[in-house]
């Protein structure tokens, strides 16, 4: 079967004449090497490659409503858990050989897959490790999106004005690992589709709802309306995390502060309880990503034990 070309126009990718595309389901046949028989994208200065590379900028992501997923782990999770949002997958010949299962899953899902030279891959993203996907941005902003994400929730992480993309991505990953039902980024926080955030989630961005663009007051109101106890993580807390079993057993949301300034006073005043993590060594504090992981896992453990006793 020869590669097929989409008949659907896309003004983001309007140079379709240079788009060698393989769309599944199909069998990959290889004679000498994993990309044999398939044309390779080799022009790093083409308009298409430039537009994909441009998605590293926030204004381009907002305009085109799509973002980059870089690296094998992120691309694999996008293909497995959000194939309907994956618009294109790009991989080098070396990456195709190392990660043939991603090729197979993408083709089986009917996705467009493109083999590129390393030079083209580097032009699109120097951090892609040979694998890159362009993914449609999910519309999950504002109060209605928060209410929908919180329906039936037991554990939620809320980031208030988080600015560090690595920390934001790590918190999304920790929330996913702890079994949280959603992550809310209060208005003024970093864009969760920024490349470093996406990389730091290691694919968790596609495992649970991530809601943005909601004011802090509206977020707390939605949390209370969903029946969640709102806990603020702060070093000046009235409760020690490891002595607050009754708080942790409840369905709850953790408010997590800005890396430099912690939680704002309005967040502390709206919380049902302010909880601190004890420091046993000489460190002044934990960074927000580490603190989030500790708090979320403490709640997950307490909820599981309480459920087992019920």
Model-derived regions: residue spans:
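Short beta->alpha linker loops
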Residues: 70-73, 119, 163, 193, ...
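Arg/Lys-rich RNA-binding interfaces used to dock onto structured RNA substrates
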Residues: 1-165, 188, 309-310
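RNA substrate-binding interface of SAM-dependent RNA methyltransferases
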Residues: 3, 114, 140-237
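Glycine- and other small-residue-rich loops at beta-strand/loop junctions that grip anionic moieties
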Residues: 41, 67, 160-161, 184-187, ...
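Active-site/ligand-binding-proximal alpha/beta "capping" segment
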Residues: 231-283
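Amphipathic alpha-helical repeat scaffolds
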Residues: 71, 164-171, 286-291
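Short, hinge-like loop/turn segments at secondary-structure boundaries
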Residues: 107, 131, 200-204, 248-251
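Structured adenosyl-cofactor binding patch, chiefly the S-adenosyl-L-methionine
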Residues: 133, 174-178, 189-205, 265, ...
């Amino acid at each position: 079967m020869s590669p097929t070309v989409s008949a659907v126009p896309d003004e983001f990718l309007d140079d379709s004449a240079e788009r060698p595309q393989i769309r599944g389901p199909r069998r990959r046949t290889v004679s000498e090497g994993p990309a044999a028989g398939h044309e390779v994208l080799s022009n790093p200065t083409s308009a298409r490659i430039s537009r994909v590379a441009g998605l590293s900028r926030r204004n381009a992501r907002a305009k085109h409503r799509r973002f980059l997923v870089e690296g094998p782990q992120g691309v694999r999770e996008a293909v497995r858990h959000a194939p309907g949002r994956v618009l294109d997958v790009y991989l080098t010949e070396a990456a195709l050989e190392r990660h043939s299962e991603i090729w197979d899953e993408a083709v089986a899902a009917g996705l467009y897959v493109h083999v590129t030279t390393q030079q083209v891959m580097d032009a699109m993203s120097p951090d892609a490790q040979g694998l890159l996907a362009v993914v449609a941005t999910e519309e999950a902003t504002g109060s209605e999106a928060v209410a929908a994400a919180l329906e039936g929730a037991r554990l939620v992480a809320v980031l208030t004005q988080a600015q560090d993309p690595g920390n934001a991505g790590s918190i999304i990953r920790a929330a996913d690992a702890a079994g949280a039902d959603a992550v809310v980024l209060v208005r003024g926080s970093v864009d969760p589709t920024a490349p470093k955030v996406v990389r730091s989630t290691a694919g968790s961005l596609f495992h649970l709802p991530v809601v943005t663009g909601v004011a802090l007051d509206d977020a707390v109101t939605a949390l209370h309306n969903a029946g969640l106890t709102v806990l603020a993580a702060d070093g000046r807390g009235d409760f020690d995390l490891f002595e607050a079993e009754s708080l942790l057993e409840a369905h709850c949301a953790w408010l997590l502060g800005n890396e430099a300034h912690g939680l704002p006073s309005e967040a502390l005043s709206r919380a049902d309880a302010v909880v601190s993590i004890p420091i046993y060594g000489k460190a002044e504090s934990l960074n927000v990503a580490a603190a989030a992981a500790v708090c979320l896992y403490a709640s997950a453990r307490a909820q599981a034990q309480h459920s087992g006793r019920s």
